[in-house]
UniProtKB/Swiss-Prot annotation:
The lineage of its organism: Bacteria, Pseudomonadati, Pseudomonadota, Alphaproteobacteria, Rhodospirillales. It comes from Rhodospirillum rubrum (strain F11). Belongs to the CcmL/EutN family. SUPFAM superfamilies: EutN/CcmL-like. Keywords: Bacterial microcompartment. One of its GO terms (cellular component) is bacterial microcompartment. Residues 1-83 form the BMV domain. Probably forms vertices in the bacterial microcompartment (BMC) predicted to be involved in glycyl radical-based 1,2-propanediol metabolism in this organism. This is Bacterial microcompartment shell vertex protein GrpN. Pfam families: EutN_CcmL. It is found in: Bacterial microcompartment. Homopentamer with a small central pore. InterPro entries: EutN_CcmL, EutN_CcmL_sf.
Length: 89
């Protein structure tokens, strides 16, 4: 899992059937200091996240399981919206 910031949405009318009915977001990966590290990923939203929110992203089979679509092409999913982050230093 990693922390990310929602920076946009994706609209795709032609896509794999297993993505039907999903909301797709563009998420920027964040460092431990909540600074974008330059990489982005398209993810499925399972919690109703919006632009600008800090989110928890799960990847791989855990992402598929979180959507209830175990046999889908989903590789990453937002599984939580972050309220606060505390780090040492």
């Amino acid at each position: 899992m990693y922390l990310g910031k929602v920076i946009g949405t994706v609209v795709s009318t032609s896509k794999n059937e297993s993505l039907s009915g999903t909301k797709l977001l563009v998420v920027a990966r964040l460092t431990e200091k909540l600074i974008p590290d330059g990489s982005t990923q398209v993810v499925v939203d399972t919690v109703g996240a919006g632009n600008g929110e800090i989110v928890i992203v799960s990847c791989g089979s855990s992402a598929r399981q979180s959507t209830g679509k175990d046999h889908s092409v989903i590789d990453a999913a937002v599984v939580g919206i972050v309220d606060t982050v505390e780090t040492v230093n």
